[in-house]
Design a protein with these regions (language model features):
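Rossmann-fold NAD(P)-binding glycine/threonine-rich loop
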Residues: 339-352, 361-388, 393-401
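Rossmann-like NAD(P)H-binding beta-loop-alpha module
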Residues: 379-382, 386-445, 455, 459, ...
Length: 596
């Protein structure tokens, strides 16, 4: 088979192998054929047919002298591994240019009955690394230290370095020599998934590329390689989802509805490998079957939520350990909560080559050092930390700012309405509907927080402005933003009950000001502004000539003034709130990770 099916459930039978390929695979752990049995039939050019005794009707694998590609044009025939590997490194400055060092190494090992299956030496000759089975490692170290005792004592060589808990992997295919880029593809795939290669070797025949990794990364390595070389018609993206409230639930509905289309048109397979919500979680490294939660043929988030209640209990530590411990390739953690504790896990995930997509704006608006550290960790590890929906839900605001800056433009000014709640309130207030009633309406219709003072304080807008300012290249924290309250501080100090009781006392002053504004053709807008590196949020009056004047309902709008878009700023406008558009923005971030 292409790989060990006990490790890779997508492994499948190989149609044809050459004698050389079969021998290479057997030497590296494939146990179906005993290597010494191949030689006699090879010299007589007798084909070998391997069949499954439990499924004799299957085609099986035929071994011949033919060394061509398989029927799908793949140069790689199979992947094999040895999981009990130890690596001994013989090193020293005196080894350079000295004849006979390697002869002494291998003569000593052979004299002590120690077999070696991997040798790696750079052209500098400063060191030679030797791979062998764990049971031989201690003895090999001992006899090599004895052999080179004089050089070690003189300081010309170092004591043998022994590394344990390793595994050796080999990719095999005679046609690799005719296919440029195999090694590049192999090591590039490993690197993108955070897998470091400790030693590697390739013979001049180019039939086998062998390399050593940490044993704990063996399963991940095999899956990554197999997916890259044998399942290339589908790119697999493994998703961990935390939070299945309105946004998370809508995201799952969108993924379930689009999954087949993505496989057909984009060759992208999205596997949901973990779902956590509240105190429960379910994990499956092969993918959670969303079809198990269908109602009349359609995915039901309500059914999933009911099923999750019966799942194993989970807490933050369990979530952290499962996501990292699953050690799965091409993975992304999606946070659809508002939890600061969940946001605190991002750095560990990024450090373990797990991309992060966050609808949660806590991390991106936290202290600047934390924000910068997350961005830098993602950059160094070659993964993504994306949070487009932190500002403007599904509106492409952050991506647009990033594109402008990456193309050499400079952000000079941002002017925006970023609170759908406040825009709804100030669009709804009228002679018939006083200010206090519009606040109640915003809460009842789901725009406002359960405690609407969170919205009225402008805190959420400040967070969004801080995020935009940072993405625009400015170092800013929340306390740096100048804030102007439009209701007295006393309304924020008391209880929520007192707030609702006293809120109507503001109606008269708001109505008097509204009448004056109406006569002057003005409207209220709660504006977030970045100018000359300074941020501010306040309630402003705009006239009918201002771009913010006609903003309807709970929509958001942003004006971006740059060196290039100077006289006429770029304008982005649309729904800035709502579960479905926010989920669509999260989905778009996930898709951009699939495209890297």
């Amino acid at each position: 088979m292409t790989a060990d099916p006990r490790v890779i459930n997508t492994a499948y039978p190989i149609d044809t192998l050459s004698y050389v390929e079969a021998t290479e695979l057997c030497n590296f752990g494939a146990k179906v054929v005993y290597p010494p049995t191949i030689y006699p039939v090879c010299i007589k050019n007798i084909p070998i047919l391997i069949k499954n005794t439990f499924r004799p009707e299957d085609k099986g694998t035929i071994i011949t002298n033919d060394n061509g590609c398989d029927e799908n044009g793949r140069a790689i025939k199979g992947i094999s591994s040895i999981n009990n590997t130890s690596l001994i490194t013989v090193s020293g400055l005196s080894m350079v240019g000295v004849i006979g060092v390697n002869q002494r190494i291998f003569t000593t090992l052979a004299a002590n009955g120690i077999s070696v299956f991997l040798v790696s030496q750079a052209s500098s000759e400063n060191s030679t690394s030797i791979g062998m089975r764990d049971e031989d490692a201690e003895r090999a170290c001992e006899v090599l230290n004895q052999e080179f005792a004089k050089e070690i004592e003189m300081g010309a060589m170092y004591k043998m370095k022994l590394e344990r808990e390793l595994a050796t992997i080999a990719i095999v295919g005679e046609n690799m020599k005719h296919t440029p880029g195999i090694a590049g593809k192999l090591f590039g795939t490993l690197g993108r998934n955070g897998i470091s290669v400790i030693a590697c070797a390739q013979g001049a025949s180019e039939t086998n590329i062998s390399f050593v990794v940490e044993r704990k990364l063996l399963r991940k390595s095999l899956n990554v390689i197999h997916d890259s070389f044998f399942l290339s018609e589908y790119q697999v993206l493994n998703v961990f989802l935390c939070g299945i409230g309105t946004v998370g639930g809508s995201l799952l509905e969108q993924i379930a509805g689009q999954r087949q289309q993505l496989m057909k048109e984009r060759n992208l397979q999205i596997n949901i490998v973990g779902i956590a919500s509240g105190h429960n979680a379910i994990f499956n490294r092969n993918g959670i079957e969303l079809s198990a939660y269908e109602d009349n043929g359609t995915f039901s988030i309500a059914k999933l939520r009911d099923g999750l209640k019966q799942a194993d209990p989970s807490d933050l530590n369990h979530l952290h350990d499962e996501v990292i411990g699953m050690n799965i390739f091409n993975s992304v953690f999606v946070d659809c909560t508002a939890s600061a504790d969940v946001a605190g896990l991002y750095e560990d995930f990024l450090s373990n080559n797990i991309s992060v997509v966050a609808a949660n704006k806590v991390a991106a608006s936290s202290d600047y050092e934390n924000y910068a550290r997350l961005k830098e960790t993602a950059r160094k590890r070659g993964v993504k930390y994306l949070f487009e929906t932190n500002v403007g839900a599904g509106l492409p605001i952050i991506n647009t700012i990033n594109d402008l800056i990456n193309s050499g433009d400079k952000i000079l000014k941002l002017e925006a309405v970023l609170s759908g709640t406040l825009n709804f309130i100030f669009n709804t207030i009228s002679a018939d509907i006083p200010f206090s009633q519009t606040v109640r309406m915003a809460k009842e219709e789901g725009y406002a927080e359960p405690d609407p003072r969170v919205d009225l304080s402008g805190k959420d807008v400040i967070r969004k402005l801080v995020i935009l300012s940072r993405e625009a290249g400015y170092r800013m924290n929340q306390e740096d933003v100048e804030k102007h309250l439009f209701i007295p501080q006393s309304f924020f100090d008391g209880s929520l009950e007192d707030f609702w009781k006293n809120l109507p006392s503001l109606d008269a002053s708001f109505e008097a000001e509204r009448k004056q504004m109406e006569a002057s053709h003005q409207r209220w807008r709660f504006v977030a502004k970045l100018e000359h590196g300074k941020g501010s949020v306040k309630l402003e009056k705009v006239d009918e000539h201002h771009p913010l004047y006609d903003l309807e309902g709970s929509n958001n709008i942003i004006l971006i003034t740059t060196e290039r878009y100077n006289q006429y700023p770029m304008l982005i406008q649309g729904y800035g709130a709502g579960a479905s558009v926010t989920a669509a923005g999260v989905f778009a971030d996930i898709m951009s990770i699939a495209n890297i």
